């Protein structure tokens, strides 16, 4: 299913790669509609630990060469606050840029892997 996420914007700002598309596997009522305040609380810690997040990226160069990588990490509900704390820690230590920047722009390619339990595999 094609979706429009912030990753599409930040991906271009971080890499300069045009024509980025994002597809997500969705099952059941993963994207409910209506009054979102009526949604149940997020997953429990046990549920988050049982369901890790995975994403695949494929890039095709102008010469037709294809590069693929997979990131596997903790559940998104866990990853987001861990990454925010890591980013804040690094900013407080002086690692920052003025104006708009993505995490990859500011902290470099290895930022995602600084989050414990995260592994990126290149194919």
Task: List PLM regions with ranges.
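C-terminal catalytic/substrate-binding lobe primarily of soluble NAD(P)-dependent oxidoreductases
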Residues: 1-123
